Regions:
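A conserved acidic beta->alpha catalytic loop
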Residues: 49-57, 97
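Acidic helix N-cap motif at the loop->helix transition within catalytic regions
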Residues: 26-30, 54-63, 102
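Conserved donor nucleotide-binding strand/loop of the catalytic core
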Residues: 43-46, 57-84
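Short, acidic, metal-binding catalytic loop of nucleotide-sugar glycosyltransferases
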Residues: 33-42
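Hydrophobic helical membrane-anchoring modules
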Residues: 1-10, 180-235
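Short aromatic/hydrophobic "clamp" motif used to bind/position activated sugar donors
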Residues: 90
């Protein structure tokens, strides 16, 4: 379900970057400014707002090709952006995550080999000495299982994304659920180039508390727990 378009610059190249946001006024401008070189190359940046109350859409508008509104929920927001994307490849980027230099070239090279989808390695911004360890484990686990997380900037051929029905509309683990379906089509391209994602989740809740929580939620999900129940525990 597409929302309201507030900017209509036709800059779609072969890559469409979809950024779901909710109350990201503090960082959205810097995040989108980092994507300016990609826009200059003709790639498309689509911001999808889930009902921000802090002026995020207005701040984003000068730095995006489209700013859309959607019902709240990351999966819904990403599906909304994908519906209006003009690129051959979709890249889903969290608002607190930065792409590495050469990201588009890395994705292009992966897709040129016939890869249908993939993700980047991740590193975590912050002072904790545990962050490199956590990131290394996330990257290793993803290579081992073929499951990607949203922090790793998932990319997928647009036609395949639509053929599979997009993200399942669920409040948590939507990235895991999509990965499960995508890996039935092909193994992911696990790019060694690293995105930089915020460590604020770990810093706010505590590193070990967050690790244990995420392990518990993931284990429960694999055992069939409802995403709605898990989302309440995550909050």
């Amino acid at each position: 379900m597409a929302g309201t378009q507030t900017r209509t610059t036709p800059a779609a190249g072969w890559l469409s970057i979809v950024v779901p946001v909710l109350d990201e006024a503090a960082g959205v401008v810097a995040a989108l400014q980092a994507l300016a070189p990609l826009r200059e190359c003709g790639h498309e940046v689509i911001v999808v707002d889930g009902g921000s109350r802090d002026g995020t859409p207005a701040l984003a508008a000068p730095w995006a090709d489209r700013v859309l509104s959607s019902e709240r929920g990351r999966a819904r927001q990403m599906n909304t952006g994908a519906e209006l994307a003009g690129g051959e490849v979709l890249l889903f980027l969290h608002a607190d995550t930065l792409l590495p230099a050469g990201a588009a070239a890395a994705v292009r090279a992966a897709v040129a080999t016939g890869t249908a989808w993939g993700r980047f390695d991740v590193r975590i911004a912050g002072a904790s000495a545990w962050f490199p360890v956590i990131a290394a484990f996330m990257n290793w686990r993803s290579r081992l299982t073929g499951i990607a997380t949203g922090d790793q900037a998932i990319f997928v051929q647009t036609a395949l994304f639509h053929r599979l029905g997009g993200y399942a509309v669920q409040p948590l683990m939507e990235d895991v659920e999509l990965s499960r379906r995508l890996r039935k089509v092909s193994k992911p391209a696990c790019l060694k180039e690293r995105v930089l994602t915020s460590g604020r989740r770990w810093e706010t809740r505590g590193v070990w508390r967050t690790i244990l929580l995420m392990w518990r939620l993931r284990w429960a999900y694999w055992r069939g727990a409802s995403p709605e129940v898990l989302a309440r525990a995550y909050r």
